[in-house]
Amino acid sequence: MSHCSCHDKPQHSLLPAAYRILSITRHTPLEWNFRVAVDFPAHWGQFVEVSLPRVGEAPISVSDYGDGWIDLLIRNVGKVTSALFTLKEGDNVWLRGCYGNGYPVDTLRHKPLLVVAGGTGVAPVKGLMRYFVENPQEIGQLDMILGYKNRDCVLYKEEMATWRGKHNLVLTLDEGEADDRYQIGRVTDRLADMTLSDIDTMQAIVVGPPIMITFTVKMLLQKGLKPEQIWVDYERRMACSVGKCGHCRMGEVYVCTDGPIFNYAVAQRFAD
């Protein structure tokens, strides 16, 4: 698969275009995956603006991509997403993008990688995890700690089941009872229990609610990682997606153009 950046797309525009929905997968009552046929390049960690005429638009992360398609995990939480949930396979959805920088795959290759993600924050990093699970020669040790509120909120259950045994995958729940598939507690509880090897070369990715990112990064630093080894995903109030409206500005950076993936050596300087 190509790792092209959508920054190179010559037709990059503020005007959305219609694209066909190939399939819809219902992970939970509130979270559905829309696979959409596209003719533009995409990269894990980037995002598109998804819209419907006379309804509005919303920024949605690219959770995975392939030859001529992208996956968008959409949570039904507002006017736009509620309207999207009335669509079916074969219908059109309007997209503009891709936008943002995406994950630094070349920097991550052949190094130990720890991914810590919570809730729908699993979606922006899901495709990257799948790539490394399916291409173990491209990565060192791969550890994944994924947290959800309860069993009913777990995303990508079928795929996660195939990942077990190939790499260290920990699924942890805020609520419920532990069994052979799930542990109980927050992602930081599981991280506290983990012994990290190859600290000097390890890379870490943290995706989720802001408070989760804050405490997870703090723990990683306490465990010996340097800010330069940590990557965070800040998805904040993006509107125009081209750095003009200022809604997503954090200090001197714009999440939509400078991010949403930031090295923590940069992110720690944000004056929010």
From Swiss-Prot:
**Any GO MF annotation of the entry:** 2 iron, 2 sulfur cluster binding
Taking the first listed entry, what is the main subcellular location of this protein, grouped into a coarse class? cytoplasm
Query: PROSITE patterns of this UniProt entry?
Result: FAD_FR
Which residues participate in NAD(+) binding?
166, 168-213
Q: Which GO terms describe its cellular component?
A: cytoplasm
Domain FAD-binding FR-type: start-end pairs: 14-105
Sites binding [2Fe-2S] cluster sit at: 240, 245, 248, 256
**Matching InterPro entries, A to Z?**
Cyt_c3_hydrogenase_gsu, Dihydroorotate_DH_Fe-S-bd, FAD-bd_FR_type, FNR_nucleotide-bd, OxRdtase_FAD/NAD-bd, PyrK_electron_transfer, Riboflavin_synthase-like_b-brl, Sulphite_reductase_B
Induction annotation = By sulfite. Repressed by oxygen.
Pfam families per the UniProt record, alphabetical: DHODB_Fe-S_bind, NAD_binding_1
List keywords of the entry alphabetically. Answer: 2Fe-2S, Cytoplasm, Electron transport, FAD, Flavoprotein, Iron, Iron-sulfur, Metal-binding, NAD, Transport
- What job does this protein perform? This enzyme catalyzes the hydrogen sulfide production from sulfite. It is strictly anaerobic. It is regulated by electron acceptors rather than by cysteine.
Question: Could you say which protein family the record assigns here?
Answer: Belongs to the PyrK family.
Q: What is this protein called?
A: Anaerobic sulfite reductase subunit B
Please name the gene that encodes this protein. Answer: asrB
